[in-house]
Amino acid sequence: MFESLVPIIVAVLTGVAGPVLIVVIKNYLDKKKKPVDMVEKALEVSKLITDKIEHIKEEFQADRVWVAQFHNGGHFYPTGRSIAKFSIFYETVNSGVSSIQSNFQNIPVNLFSKSINELLENDSIQIFDFKDEKIATFGLKYIAEEHGCKSGYFFAIKTIDNKFIGFLGLDYTKRKTKLDIETINHISNHAAAMRSEEHTS
């Protein structure tokens, strides 16, 4: 009689012990994994993006290259609706060129609605000469003049599922610079490649 119960006992023990053993092994392995340090990860991402924009500055002979990201900036009173803002998080400049990063922190999106909408719809803005009245500047002319920018090129950074998360800017302060379509496309590819680095920050 006992012999007929052996297969049942083995099946019960296997059914119970198997999943328990899997959980024990999984917990053991999870404890051995090094936890991801948030600060370490942020610094890693920052280095990747800083290296990328430094490369872009050198490759395209820009005087200032920067990356802005959209973020939440508090809430409207009394509706409680979220305020969309952007800040320049990364910047590299040539010697003798002023930084603009500290001037562009927590900026409400609606203050630059023309230019941001243009980036949202068409992915780039190309302004060869900010002083040329025939060129559309999308509300950026006075800001550019204030920061000594003669030519500016701006590129949307979007996620794979087309969410607009930020933008890349190239400023030419020492001379007007006209970039050809091949160069524009090349920089667009750089902006597209940034989406993975930025989205993980």
PLM feature spans:
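A short, aliphatic-rich beta-strand micro-motif
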Residues: 150-159
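Well-ordered, non-membrane alpha-helical segments in soluble/globular domains
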Residues: 45-52, 109-113, 185-188
